[in-house]
Amino acid sequence: MLQISFNGARLKEARLFNKKSITQIAEFLNVSKQMVSKYEKGRATPSEESLEILEKKLKFPRDFFFGNDNFSLSSTGTFFRSRYTATQTEKMPAEINKNYVALIRDYLGEFIDFPNLDWGLSGLDYTPQEYASYIREKWELGDRPIDNLSLLMEEKGFVISRIDTQSDKVDAFGSAVKVNNNEYYVVMLEGIEYSFYRQQFSLAHELGHWLMHEKECLEECLAHSTCSINVSYANDGILTLVTQLGISFPALRETYTVYI
């Protein structure tokens, strides 16, 4: 009979997803921090009682902690559009969600013919103004306002998802995720109560990062889990795209304190 062993990496994943520290898990289980560390490193297995507590506190099913990955997954450094006070603990649930979205997209790709992203459009030697014109020409947008940037980006091969991790310090983020031999660019919008215009702005920002920074991110940020945004770039280049999206300036001013 095949015996499935406890997967410590899954415990760590569930812990980070729930923004919990090793100390907090140790308190839940009434064990030492060293023991929790052993669990996560696969050097020890929690008792049945401890497993029941983990299921309840972390809200992951028991089978999750005994599963094994049958895929390979890697991600470039993530561009977060967030406040400077956002911590790694606050960003981690969104990071894990991003990977889940990429896995779902990869699975569904076996049954659905999704559009393919043209990676050759990113990393070209253009100014933000030139890039805005170039993309409009390549995507045959003309001079008309873009009514729904989310739909447009999905039609062009981006993977867009909305989540709510109860974070008020992260608006949106995106990065390339490779599942087995398939690469996707996933853009996550944080929160479910933001206005349509704010989501449009966030998507324009992430599109700008993909166009101008994705290859730079791949080369320079692999040693880090996240990449900070360049504020001067955001205030200069991204607004060039935003002003062509059909967003009303009063709404933009109210949300971002941006004056055009």
Where are these regions (language model features)?
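Short juxta-domain linker segments that transition from a proline/glycine-rich
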Residues: 1-260
